[in-house]
């Protein structure tokens, strides 16, 4: 039951009505028996500064940040973590010492399955990343953290690819990072130990689309990991095609759950988060069980 003592968490975005975050966070809060509630806050870009001041005034403990605010919120925060600085985006904000502090848990979300269920020695391995937008930044940083020998980012716009590459110039990641246009994929796919889709191609409602065709995936190594950040539909065409070549498939639902787990650890200041409950709540909500 919500009372005057209930502590507030939430997610800000525009739109935010379809966010899955309240489903999994409230399931975890209920399982833990805590007097918290996690709410969606639809906030238009023009209202962002006023909105986060208001969230402070009403005592919000912390909040998630989604599109289109992940970059725009940075100058409005008192402090951001080195991880958020490197990625250039914030997805988790916490109230500390009467100030807003931002970080990014997308890296933790992305690498979690690669450190647990699918753990291997990545130091001699090659990662190929499709897309060079905001999501790709977290994936690049995650691959570097895992120790990949080579990280290849593939995009369609030469100018944006160069901007992406130069944005890492002051980071040790630059040594491992190469960028390529889409026509180079025929050479990269056979080398890939990890192939990640960070593009929206294949996301609902365009469920019949894939960033790569069956022919382009034909030379993917058996046992390579295909990882799609999309979680609706499940599985995507990209993952279905990769599995037909003998690849191991990971979808975006696990990343969503694990970045949420990392955020709850920060807000609740405890390590014991019921990840299975969060995963099951999402699967049930999406009609996957």
UniProtKB/Swiss-Prot annotation:
NADP(+) binds at residues 131-135, 229, 252. It catalyses: shikimate + NADP(+) = 3-dehydroshikimate + NADPH + H(+). Gene3D superfamilies: Leucine Dehydrogenase, chain A, domain 1, NAD(P)-binding Rossmann-like Domain. It holds the Pfam family SDH_C. It is an enzyme of class 1 (oxidoreductase). GO terms for cellular component: cytosol. Keywords: Amino-acid biosynthesis, Aromatic amino acid biosynthesis, NADP, Oxidoreductase. Its EC number is 1.1.1.25. The active site is at 70 (proton acceptor). HAMAP family: Shikimate_DH_AroE (MF_00222). Belongs to the shikimate dehydrogenase family. NCBIfam families: aroE, PRK00258.2-2. Homodimer. This is Shikimate dehydrogenase (NADP(+)). It comes from Trichormus variabilis (strain ATCC 29413 / PCC 7937). The lineage of its organism: Bacteria, Bacillati, Cyanobacteriota, Cyanophyceae, Nostocales. The gene is aroE.
